């Protein structure tokens, strides 16, 4: 038995401007070198860009985008008897949200363009329409899980 205490989940404080925990998660994942004000500026201007491009509520678009990118299953490597198997496992809710936010930000960074806020806004808009690289990443993950379904009985 492990002697460590169980992982403590902490309550997520909503951001002061939009009062949305999802926006807070976006800000925290964009964060680099502890410069939260810069990441807030990037996310808030991305939300403003979304609001200018689409006449819907930008928070609903962000929520839809993150929901569309959440994977149902993922691949985990499991070493059994000297060989490593790619075992498909279900994704828990919090991990799914975290993965989807990470993928959206990762693929926003590698998009062509100058400002990160524009690239993030475009990636979120594409993800809300089931397009873009983050959706492709989710589909690739699902294909890998389907291909390795034979090893599902090795689940953790």
UniProtKB/Swiss-Prot annotation:
Compartments where located: Plastid, Chloroplast
PROSITE patterns, per the entry: RIBOSOMAL_S7 (PS00052)
Highest taxon of source: Eukaryota
Pfam families (alphabetical): Ribosomal_S7 (PF00177)
Matching Gene3D superfamilies: Ribosomal protein S7 domain (1.10.455.10)
Protein's job: One of the primary rRNA binding proteins, it binds directly to 16S rRNA where it nucleates assembly of the head domain of the 30S subunit.
NCBIfam families: rpsG_bact (TIGR01029)
Protein name (record): Small ribosomal subunit protein uS7c
Organism for this UniProt entry: Cyanidium caldarium (Red alga)
Protein encoded by which gene: rps7
């Amino acid at each position: 038995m492990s002697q460590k205490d169980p992982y403590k989940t902490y309550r997520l404080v909503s951001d002061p401007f939009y009062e949305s925990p999802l926006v807070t998660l976006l800000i925290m994942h964009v964060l680099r070198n502890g410069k939260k004000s810069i990441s807030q500026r990037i996310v808030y201007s991305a939300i403003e860009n979304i609001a200018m491009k689409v006449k819907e509520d930008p928070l609903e678009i962000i929520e839809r985008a993150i929901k569309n990118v959440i994977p149902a299953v993922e691949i985990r490597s499991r070493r059994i008897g000297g060989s490593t198997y790619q075992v498909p496992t279900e994704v828990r809710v919090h991990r799914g949200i975290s993965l989807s936010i990470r993928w959206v930000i990762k693929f926003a960074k590698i998009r062509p363009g100058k400002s990160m806020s524009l690239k993030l806004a475009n990636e979120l808009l594409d993800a809300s329409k089931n397009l873009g690289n983050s959706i492709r990443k989710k589909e690739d993950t699902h294909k890998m899980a389907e291909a390795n379904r034979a090893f599902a009985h090795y689940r953790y």
